[in-house]
């Protein structure tokens, strides 16, 4: 009896999230499905909500997403490897590093905006460009990737490492050939969560200059916008037709997310092991 | 692992190469070309965007970008020389002017449209139709003890007053407090503030006894859910409509909207052409952006400023 | 493959330095330094204006004052209402994310079929990808009226709706990371427990969860950090009326909402009102640092290592 009750409780937990997701998606699709026309995806913003398009935003978000993955996975996993496999845990500076990363996860996204504005846009002289946006997002979600990767590395049974060392492998060989492939699923999860969050961020991007009106395709070192910023702009307009258009934009955003996630999920499923 | 790494690297290289296209300024033809950067108030942003959209049809080689860092943020960038145009829902403040001067940034101030601030109440509040400025002041001033509608006017029922309005960082807030309470920033603190006027609409329409204020277009687009209150600024009760704002009879809650232009940018033909376009077509643009066009006197002033700036 | 060195007798330490290894260690350390550079950058960006701010407003007033109204005339600068607002929302969010997240994780890891898991886990992760703006509006437009319908008297902007939605948003974080940790627990442990006569509930709660505790607690800490730092949801749904209360049914303002609203608004840069952002940001940073130090100590104590 207790068995069934326990299982029921667990299912209930799962359903809270699923039901909320379902309700959200239903509302968004209800408003937004009718908005999915060619103009939304290929056109640019307009003062007529029915003609408003989000092409520059879509392209920019995709580009930033890919750049983000390219930056955050090596740096995040590299940090995790350093902390787990190489660093002497007794040293104070390594402990500080650990705490530091946990702390960065709590910093509000807007503070990353301030940071980006001061150091990347102005300090490094990058200006208000797409690359700066991608870099800020990288810093924002780096803690998530590091923490998830660390846990993934920790979960690899030590016997694997010992066995490899016993066969004469160097530390890096152990990591690259044994530990990392084993930890790949966890790393993939962390990357998925990080990417998902970054793609939906608005506040820091506005602060470093994401535009609400741009009529040409964004380039790496040029003015840019982002889909969540465009959505936020549309939602804030008084004309309610813009809100409907925003719903369409949200569907597109979720679509992009799904595609980018698919890659990471594929990786995760392929390398999932059970010890 | 290997094939994975290779695929991802390839994808990334493709992205970077695609992204390293030319700069934003479109090419040639026999028209003008260039990039004009505008930033500032999120209220005025849609106006500049509407103007940019229409301008592109005339001059396809010119690209205009619009940001919404806020009036203050816009001026900060403007006075560092980072932008060509600054959108503003209030005139430039003295401290901001000083920074511009220090950095050697000369500019021209253009009036581009008018906006009204509508005072609205919950649809069920049928006892009130018009409020005087004095009454509004008593409701909104700092330390105000007005808690119920009855405190506003003894003939009103004893219904709790639920106040909504823009946050203290908004230009609308600055303007309202300046005109109603008499000092910018002077307001009671116990009201529901929000960044986003659509949220204020929700608040007022959802609470019986609700009272709030925001730009005219937010009332017009949500007419069915709100009740507009006439404001008596000394000349009788006037309703907030486009006509009254343009005629100047909806006082004191009519505000002008500005675009500031950097003088050095003005030397570029595309910038001058853009401003000229705005002034020539201001009625059409204001209409598209849900604002009120300039009065005849304001238009004359703007044209004068343009003549001066063009040199 | 084992490398064969010519004739050298077995030794505990390699007789020549492997430069490749040193280079790699250096590169990895460099990666780690990125996070250090970020923190340093944040501190630099925050400290200077914050120090300016504290020259004008005393730290004592700031920390103990009970009214936060810096942008009004005259201003008051007591940060406690903002702190209470953050606490109220975070508390609700964690109360949702932790139990439901962990429950979902246990189900996915110990009860669900592999195929079901393959579908459900990514579905949950979609929840993590919904823009926070959408969550904010959902809280305002759906959750608040729903709360009123079921009889809870909430203000139109309130911490409860924002906290509930934030909690649901964090469920994937807790669930996905906890579930990965549980998946990584060697099957040998499970089989051993079954062999000793345990049933599924026992195995799940007394063997797997304790074994995966490090990862599970890490997911909790991450969720708490995210909850404290979340901006958009609270900006839209929790309100911008700093109130000195922990009652989640009231309108509040969190530290993050204040920073976001003021940072993107019309306040002239360089003014004392603008500098409040940095003072509040610094407070947030210091407070979470303290929390994380405590949390890391706790995690270290509870971590179980198998093998």
Show which residues each predicted segment covers.
Chain B
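Bacterial N-terminal signal peptides that target proteins for export
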Residues: 1-8
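Hydrophobic helical h-region of N-terminal Sec-dependent signal peptides
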Residues: 8-14
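C-terminal motif of bacterial Sec signal peptides marking the signal peptidase cleavage site
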Residues: 15-19
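Flexible loop/hinge segments at secondary-structure junctions
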Residues: 20-311
